[in-house]
Amino acid sequence: MAKAIPITGSRRNVHVGSRKSSFRIQKGVIHVQTSFNNTIVAVTDIKGRVVSWSSAGTCGFKGTRRGTSFAAQIAATNAIRIVQGMQRAEVMIKGPGIGRDAVLRAIRGSGVLLTFVRDVTPMPHNGCRPPKKRRV
């Protein structure tokens, strides 16, 4: 049987760039999604295209340590470090997690000027019935 010749331009032969390469944007939007189990931080440009992202799980925190404020702070600094030269940013925070304040502290400590901070946590207008309360 003849050996298969790889097609030039196929995905195996193309060098895929690393996720940690640096991007240059002047103004962006930082989306923060916090829960009690994890924190996800995504940096987008004005049009909404994701430039970089990070989470507490990708930073090496496993299990219950992903939900801590320190893990959220590390995730925010890793997501912002990839974007070089971003001067102004809008922050959208979603969710009830512990890491909300820690993410804001990390963003302000990185030198990015915050134009506004918006809480976009979805609130039901008496929608679905919530799950029953836990009895421990």
Swiss-Prot record:
Part of the 30S ribosomal subunit. Belongs to the universal ribosomal protein uS11 family. Keywords: Plastid, Ribonucleoprotein, Ribosomal protein, RNA-binding, rRNA-binding. Gene3D superfamilies: Ribosomal protein S11 (3.30.420.80). It is found in: Plastid. One of its GO terms (molecular function) is structural constituent of ribosome. GO terms for cellular component: plastid; ribonucleoprotein complex; ribosome. InterPro entries: Ribosomal_uS11, Ribosomal_uS11_CS, Ribosomal_uS11_sf. Signal peptide: none annotated. This is Small ribosomal subunit protein uS11c. GO terms for biological process: translation. It comes from the Eukaryota.
